Amino acid sequence: MSWIGIKKAINRAGTQVMLKTGHIEQTIDKEYEFQEKRYRTMEENSIKLQKNLRLYLDSLRLLTNSQINIAESLNSFYGTNNDKRSSNISRTGSVNTGDKIQTIHEEEGEEKEEEENDNTTTTTTTTTTTITTTNTTYNYNNLIQEYYATIKQLNDSCIANLENPYNQTVLNPIARFNSYYIEINEIIKKRHNKLLDYDAMKNKLRKLIENPTTNISPSMKTNIIELNHNQYEEKLKIYNQELTEVESKYVEINNQLLIELPKLINHRISYFDPSFESFVKIQLRFFNENYHVLNQLQLKLDAQTRQDYIEGKLEDRIDDVLRKMKKLDITSGLD
């Protein structure tokens, strides 16, 4: 900062103190204050919106990662063994993951093993699920393995297909809009400085008019009255010129803001409308893809489980399993 800039900053700081203490009359423009208040509200809301939109994308990543973690834990918990429940799934279906449609072909073979355990015969059914994609074929022994693979592929496809349009149509436009605040705030700051200069100059001129002798140098007080009057008139002329100059600068920037701030505020609706529409469509696409894929897996659950769920009997089935577990010797001490 140059010496002139430092001097101006010091003078403006002194003017601010005198304004706060009431020693200088402050210029008030209620129309401008109203428009600046509207502008500050818009600035606060749009910056908050940008932050929340970034957090929304992060939350979707967190959601899909949590789904993968749960699916991975379920896959480890179930292991590779089949049970009767996983063998009763529907045999055909299709999974749509975004742009790819995966066709599911299932081949089942039944292996019956008869074992005599207290004259009881046990029948075990083995199910193999084959998912064919464009280049790769995956074989799964149960629905949990298929669920884990499907969720993982959902994460890879949905988030990858979502990020680019979300950034281009939602995040980037609002970031570009918010970037203008830096320039606008600089103009508002400049207007504030010009107002301080204007108020300080008005106060200086007022003091000269009210107390002309205090603005005459001591050496001139011994001179004749005409010279004192001439000096006063000369100083008054200089102060008036300076006041006109600072007033012109202040009025110019003040009028500019009075015209352009309302326009900027009114343009926000038409500017954000396309991004809002895109945001809704991206949400719809993301959740529709997730729903479609998970619904295909849900259709593979055995019919009895679905019926029990509809009738509210699923909890009774769980209680029945718990009762059977309690009959085991290893869990007999848990009562």
From Swiss-Prot:
GO terms under biological process: actin cortical patch localization; endocytosis; plasma membrane tubulation
Subcellular location: Cytoplasm, Cytoskeleton
Keyword Transport: no
Disruption phenotype: Does not display the endocytic, hyphal growth, virulence, or cell wall defects exhibited by disruption in related RVS161 or RVS167.
GO cellular-component term (any): medial cortex
Disulfide bridges in this chain: none
Keywords (A to Z) from UniProt: Coiled coil, Cytoplasm, Cytoskeleton
Coiled coil location: 30-56, 222-259
Domain named BAR: residues: 17-310
Biased composition (Acidic residues): 107-118
Chain positions covered by the region annotation Disordered: 105-127
Described function: Component of a cytoskeletal structure that is required for membrane curvature.
Name of this chain's protein: RVS161-like protein RVS162
